[in-house]
A protein has these predicted regions:
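Residues at alpha-helix termini
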Residues: 121, 135, 345, 391-392
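Anion-binding (especially nucleotide phosphate/pyrophosphate-binding) glycine-rich loop
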Residues: 1-92, 96-173, 177-179, 190
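Phosphate/pyrophosphate-binding loops and the adjoining catalytic core of nucleotide-dependent enzymes
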Residues: 385
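Phosphate/pyrophosphate- and phosphate-bearing ligand-binding catalytic cores of soluble enzymes
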Residues: 5-7, 11-18, 55, 183-376, ...
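Generic detector of short alpha-helix boundary/capping microenvironments
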Residues: 40, 111, 137-140, 202, ...
C-alpha cells in the first residue's frame, strides 16, 4: 500500500524533533509499491528517510520525502535465485528484488555452519534487528544495539559504535534505481564504505538508489568485540570474576533466582553483551522521546601522529605529566581522537545556547534542550563548537549529521 500526504508534519519523523513539514510525503509497504511510484512526477528534491535519526532539518522540505515500511527478517538457509520482477504485494520472507537480471545469494550457509546470512527489510528498526539477532544467538551486531534508525539507513550511513561498524557484517545491499527504474545490488566492496560514509552519500549518486533490503553475514561462533574504551571493563564487571572475556559468565545479568551452580556454567552470549551496551548507552545518551537529538553530532577526527603528539604535549603541560589523551591508533599510522574529549576540553559540556545545548553526560551530542529549539540555534551552537576546537587544537570537526 502507498500512502501519500501533502504538507506532512515531520516533527515525529526526525529525532531532533525539528518542527518542519514536507510538501509531499510518501510511505510504502513493499517493493511492488516502490515500482508503482511515478518518480518523474514527484516534487523535487527527493529525500528518502529511515528513522530520521541522523538528520537536521533546517527548514520545511520543499520536495518529496519517502519512507519505507518494508519489514521482514529472514535467515537464508539455501541458495535462492531471485525472480526477474517482484510479484509479492508485500515483502515478507523470500523478497523479490530482481528486475532485469537474476540476483543470486552465494555462499549461503546451512544451520550447522558458522556464517549465517540474514536478509532484512530496509524498514526494519535497526535495534529490533539487533534484538532478534541476539536472541537467535547470532554474533555481529550486538555492539550496535540501541542505535536509533532503520536498517536501510544503517547501510547508507555505515553506523558504528563500541569498536564495530555495520560494514563489517554487510554482505550485499539491494536497491531500486529511480533513474533507470531497475533493481540493482551492491557488494560490500562496491558500497565503498568509510567512516560514517558510503557510495550512497557521494554527491554524484546521492538519492538515486533506494535501499530495499540488506543481507548481513552474522556468525554462530562467539566473536565478542570488547577492546573499545572501557567496554571490556564494563563487561568484566557485569560478569564478575572470570578467566577470559570470551568465556565469561555474566552473573550480574542473570535472574536473581538463578542457582549459583548454574551461574558458573553460563557463558557470554550476544544477548548478554547487548544488555551491557544498552545500559551504557542509556547512561550516556538522551532518550529521543524525552529530549530531541541526532545522537553523535560530530565525527571523531583523524589526524597525523605528529599533530596528535603536539596535542598530547600541550595537554600534559596543562594537566600534568601523567595525563593521557584518549586516542586510537589506526593501521596507517594516523590517530583518531574522540571529538567528545576535545569539545569537553573547550568547556562546552552542559552549556546552553537558546533552545539548544551540549548534552551534560556526553559532549558529542547536541540536544533540543527545550523541545522548541530552532534549527538556527542548533547550527549556531555547532559553528561555535567547531571554531573553539579549531582554535584550541588546530583540528576542524565535521558534522556526522546531515543538514537538510
Amino acid at each position: 500500500m502507498i500512502k501519500s500526504t501533502y504538507y506532512q508534519d515531520l516533527t515525529k519523523m526526525n529525532t531532533f524533533r525539528m518542527k518542519v513539514k514536507a510538501k509531499c510525503f510518501i510511505e510504502y509497504d513493499s517493493v511492488a509499491d516502490l515500482v508503482d511510484i511515478e518518480f518523474d512526477e514527484l516534487s523535487r528534491p527527493i529525500l528518502h528517510i529511515g528513522g530520521g535519526s541522523n538528520l537536521l532539518f533546517t527548514e520545511d522540505f520543499k520536495g518529496t520525502v519517502l519512507h519505507s515500511k518494508i519489514n521482514f527478517i529472514e535467515i537464508l538457509d539455501e541458495c535462492q535465485s531471485i525472480p526477474e520482477a517482484p510479484s509479492q504485494a508485500s515483502l515478507g520472507p523470500s523478497p523479490n528484488p530482481g528486475v532485469g537480471k537474476c540476483l543470486l545469494h552465494t555462499n549461503v550457509t546451512s544451520s550447522d555452519s558458522a556464517e549465517v546470512l540474514v536478509s532484512v527489510g530496509a524498514g526494519v528498526i535497526f535495534d529490533d534487528f539487533c534484538d532478534w539477532a541476539a536472541k537467535e544467538g547470532l554474533w555481529g551486531v550486538e555492539n550496535l544495539s540501541y542505535i536509533p534508525g532503520e536498517v536501510g539507513a544503517s547501510a547508507v550511513q555505515n553506523i558504528g559504535a563500541y569498536g564495530v561498524e555495520v560494514k563489517e557484517v554487510i554482505k550485499t545491499v539491494y536497491c531500486y534505481d529511480i533513474v533507470e527504474e531497475e533493481f540493482v545490488s551492491f557488494s560490500n566492496e562496491e558500497c565503498e564504505y568509510g567512516y560514517r560514509d558510503s557510495i550512497f552519500k557521494s554527491p554524484e549518486i546521492k538519492g538515486r538508489y533506494i535501499v530495499t533490503h540488506v543481507v548481513f553475514a552474522l556468525s554462530r561462533e562467539p566473536r565478542p568485540v570488547l577492546d573499545y574504551g572501557h567496554l571490556k571493563d564494563a563487561v568484566m564487571s557485569a560478569c564478575g570474576e572470570c578467566q577470559s572475556a570470551s568465556e565469561a559468565p555474566f552473573q550480574d545479568l542473570l535472574p536473581q533466582e538463578t542457582p549459583a551452580a548454574e551461574k558458573t556454567t553460563k557463558r557470554i552470549t550476544p544477548e548478554m553483551i547487548r544488555k551491557v551496551i544498552i545500559k551504557i548507552r542509556k547512561e550516556k545518551l538522551p532518550e529521543p522521546s524525552v529530549m530531541g537529538s541526532a545522537g553523535s553530532f560530530f565525527k571523531n577526527p583523524v589526524i597525523s601522529y605528529e599533530h596528535f603528539h603536539k596535542i598530547e604535549q600541550a595537554a600534559k603541560a596543562e594537566h600534568g605529566a601523567d595525563f593521557k589523551v584518549p586516542h586510537y591508533e589506526l593501521s596507517d599510522g594516523a590517530v583518531k581522537v574522540p571529538a567528545a574529549w576535545m569539545i569537553e576540553q573547550c568547556g562546552w559540556k552542559g552549556r546552553r545556547s537558546g533552545g539548544a545545548a551540549v548534552y551534560e553526560k556526553q559532549p558529542l551530542v547536541i540536544v533540543n534542550y527545550t523541545g522548541e529549539a530552532y534549527p538556527e540555534e542548533i547550527i549556531g551552537l555547532e559553528r561555535r563548537i567547531i571554531a573553539s576546537v579549531k582554535d584550541k587544537f588546530g583540528v576542524e570537526l565535521h558534522p556526522e549529521v546531515d543538514h537538510i
